[in-house]
Amino acid sequence: MNKLVLGNLLHRPLRTLISIAAVGIEVVMILSIVAIMIGQVTNASRQTGGIGGDIIVRPPNASFISSVGGAPVPAKIAEVLRKLPHITVAAPTITDFNMTGGVETIWGIDFDSYNALRPFVFLAGGPFTGPHDVMVDDLYARSAPKGPGHERAVGSTIQILGHPFRISGIVEHGKGGRVFLPIHTLGALMGSPDNASLFYIKSDDLKNQELIRQEILATPGLSLYQVQTIQEWMSLMTPEHLPGFNIALRAVIGIAMIVGFLVIFQSTYTAVLERTREIGILKSMGASKAYIVNVVLRETAIVTIAGIVAGIFFTEVMRIILGYRFPTLPFPITADWRIRGAVIALVGSTLGAVYPAWKAARKDPIDALAYD
């Protein structure tokens, strides 16, 4: 039977290759979209975990997505927080979107307090020396467009929110953001020079986090503020808690599965029509319906497995290329999603082959032999 299956596939090599390519594209589509979407979530969680704070304090009704909400509260609240027991550092921070040259989040920080949470690791240069200085991380520096005038080295000038800034230092990635401005400068650009978006707190002991929460909420004017530990915040940064995330993910996977289904259905159905006489010969020689179905499904399985392998391979190639060309783009491909992608492709292909296999098994041997 295996020789028969391979012979059928090799008899129409172009169609077989197209079917393999279609399944491969389905797998690439699933894995790449999942990698980009989930990569953004996991990267945001990892970056926040690297800031060094233990607690996040946000204004009432603020989104848990830190870059949404502007700078609605006075940065001087940090002075009030620093006076509370068990708080060693209170760092006011602003986060804002920059749409110049792509979507990125700009962080406005008070360098001394933010650095006290966990010190920056400078790979080149140093802290701000003026209001028009900017610090960037190493991945942002590496992702500079090619060509003169686009360099991102210490001393270079980059545009942020339509204004020129000099790069004073390049830091190791993993400290919340990729681009850091003085908090007063970013606030002024947003029209709120003395405000902040949120506050990162460092406690004297992790065991005192609940006490700190109670102290903050008991402070006049802060009773409605949101106080979360970093662990609590990170537990919210999952696909289940992001509006529309899982819906978009399922939609992409559904479209990819439909593509695989239609290609395998069309390919298998055409193959069955072309081999009507061969099917008639097999049935006249005593081949059962189950045997015919088995042959068709085995052909589909071989094509699908080859497509899955090709899809995973080219996704890895894409990951390497994107990692080199776009260092700031997280593109994790987990073993879990490799397996899921393979199962989705296999299910879609099998469903696409069921009707052609059933149709082939039902052919009357006499009619099939008379088919021209």
Regions found by a protein language model. Give the residues of each.
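Short helix-to-coil transition segments within interhelical loops
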Residues: 9, 281-290, 363, 372
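Hydrophobic alpha-helical transmembrane segments of multi-pass inner-membrane transport and secretion
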Residues: 13-40, 242-281, 301-310, 351
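Hydrophobic, regular-secondary-structure patches
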Residues: 28-105, 211-220, 225-226
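Peri-transmembrane interface segments
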Residues: 44-47, 64, 171, 215-262, ...
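The feature marks short, hydrophobic/small-residue-biased sequence motifs that occur predominantly
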Residues: 73-85, 92-133, 161, 180-183
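Mid-to-C-terminal secondary-structure elements
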Residues: 113-121, 138-192, 211-218
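Transmembrane alpha-helical interface segments in multi-pass membrane proteins
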Residues: 269, 277-323, 340, 344, ...
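C-terminal membrane-exit region of the final transmembrane helix in multipass inner-membrane proteins
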Residues: 333-372
